């Protein structure tokens, strides 16, 4: 109930509630049987609302409404609201500005155009005066593609250096991507733009943010993205709240939410069903200037539901700046290929270290391999070279990544297929410490073989226990694996095993 008026029902902990009155204290009540929780919420004042229909937008799925909606955004004063009411709005790219709210009302759908000739693009990096750029450099980071500075088609929403922005509502953003010969997921269409074939401009995202601060995304649905759905880079204080991010299982590179070199990120109460990783936390590749790939840090992922995808929550592989202080808690994974997945490889660099990583209170069902740590990830054009894939200990240099302590606590995985855990560190840079505490894994009766990690030489397997290679300390506290074929532990070059 909002101010004693019925506002709907929910079966989730993180819940999107609307209908609050701006500029006053609102009473929100949750009632479950005889139990009741009341919360007072004081909302900021909203001086003006600009309806995009008053700027000429038609919402008829035929007229191009880009300039009409952009006009409403530019006209909106500080603290105001841009209202996109119910309707289907064909658009190219919209650019955000600071200190505004954008409401995608229930029934409002932004339909992204996919014809390249209609889309603007931004360069990867622009060089300017000394000290005028990001972090005191002379560089202005704009476009990025898979961890590298790269010219990029503008996204449905593009935010460059904006702050205090909220996009919210029960509407949707639809990339309208499919496998037609002139659309982004078509293999031949996509291959024209591969880097090794001279691609100059990368695919757009649905929401792309660079150097932004205090951005909230709440309530709406994002679907059918040309590539990664939501991609913030070099941002701080970004919230993704109660979003639904969707794409077919066979769609290409459609990661759900990929924070890259960001700090203080919260992903709460979101649902994911995509063709790639649901959430992939990144921090760039080694080739980017170090100032433009700081560590991603202080990330909280909680009460999210991941169903279908390559990995539910993934670290890397483009994480040359490192990932620090990340917690994944109270989430449900279903039918993903892998559950908690860490990807790295030689060539990511000495700063590519994960530290302070905790996965806790997680339930998985029909996840093929619940835990994967892969230090031989073979994507990228050099991913299958001897340097990346050699299982021999190579000299440690500035290209060698590291792996700090990681904890997996209170996790239950049922109906698994391939292995309980597949862990491979580098022989010259072992995984420092992996702690599994209160972990229970069972296998499906009809389990089928599957390749647990994307690395050369890894064969399909079925009902295997914990496979661990090149680890300093493997700490197993109350770990139960049931239904595996063969040994529960298959260890190679593991310095110390603790069991309790």
Which positions does each model-derived feature cover?
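Extracellular/periplasmic carbohydrate-active domains that bind, remodel
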Residues: 1-500
């Amino acid at each position: 109930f909002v101010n004693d008026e019925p506002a709907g029902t929910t079966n989730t902990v993180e819940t999107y509630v609307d209908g609050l009155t701006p500029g006053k204290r609102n009473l929100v009540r949750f009632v479950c049987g005889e139990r009741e929780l009341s919360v007072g919420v004081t909302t900021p004042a909203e001086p003006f609302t600009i309806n995009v229909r008053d700027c000429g937008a038609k919402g008829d799925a035929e007229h191009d409404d880009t300039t009409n909606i952009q006009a409403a955004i530019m006209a909106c004063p500080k603290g105001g609201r841009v209202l996109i009411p119910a309707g289907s709005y064909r658009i190219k790219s919209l650019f955000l500005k600071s200190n505004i709210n954008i409401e995608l009302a229930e029934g409002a759908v932004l339909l992204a155009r996919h014809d390249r000739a209609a889309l603007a693009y931004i360069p990867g990096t622009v060089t300017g005066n000394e000290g005028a750029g990001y972090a005191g450099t002379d560089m202005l980071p704009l476009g990025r593609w898979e961890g590298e500075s790269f010219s990029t088609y503008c996204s449905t929403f593009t935010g460059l250096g904006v702050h205090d922005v909220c996009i919210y509502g029960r509407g949707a953003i639809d990339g309208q991507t499919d496998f037609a010969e002139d659309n982004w997921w078509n293999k031949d269409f996509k291959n024209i733009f591969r880097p090794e074939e001279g691609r100059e401009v990368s695919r757009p995202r649905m929401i792309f943010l660079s150097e932004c601060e205090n951005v909230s995304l709440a309530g709406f649905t994002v679907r059918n993205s040309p590539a990664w759905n939501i991609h913030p880079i070099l941002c701080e204080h970004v919230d993704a709240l109660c979003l639904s991010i969707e794409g077919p299982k066979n769609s290409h590179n459609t990661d759900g939410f990929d924070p890259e070199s960001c700090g203080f990120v919260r992903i709460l109460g979101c649902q994911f069903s995509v063709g790639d990783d649901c959430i992939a936390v990144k921090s760039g590749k080694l080739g980017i200037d170090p100032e433009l790939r700081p560590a991603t840090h202080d990330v909280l992922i909680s009460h999210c539901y991941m169903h279908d995808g390559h990995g539910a929550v993934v670290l890397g592989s483009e994480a040359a700046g490192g990932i620090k202080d990340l917690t994944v808690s109270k989430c449900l994974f279903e039918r993903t290929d892998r559950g908690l997945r860490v990807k790295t490889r030689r060539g990511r660099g000495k700063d590519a270290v994960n530290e302070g990583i905790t996965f806790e209170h997680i339930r998985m069902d029909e996840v093929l391999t619940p835990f994967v740590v892969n230090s031989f990830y073979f994507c990228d054009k050099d991913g299958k070279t001897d340097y990346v894939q050699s299982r021999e200990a190579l000299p440690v240099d500035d290209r060698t990544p590291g792996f700090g302590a990681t904890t997996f606590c209170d996790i239950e995985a049922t109906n698994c297929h391939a292995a309980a855990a597949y862990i491979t560190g580098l022989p010259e840079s072992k995984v420092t410490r992996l702690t599994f505490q209160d972990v229970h894994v069972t296998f499906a009766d009809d389990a089928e073989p599957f390749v647990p990690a994307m690395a050369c030489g890894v064969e399909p397997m079925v009902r295997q226990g914990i496979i661990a290679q090149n680890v300093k300390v493997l700490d197993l506290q109350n770990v139960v694996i049931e239904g595996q074929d063969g040994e529960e532990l298959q260890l190679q070059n593991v310095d110390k095993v603790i069991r309790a």
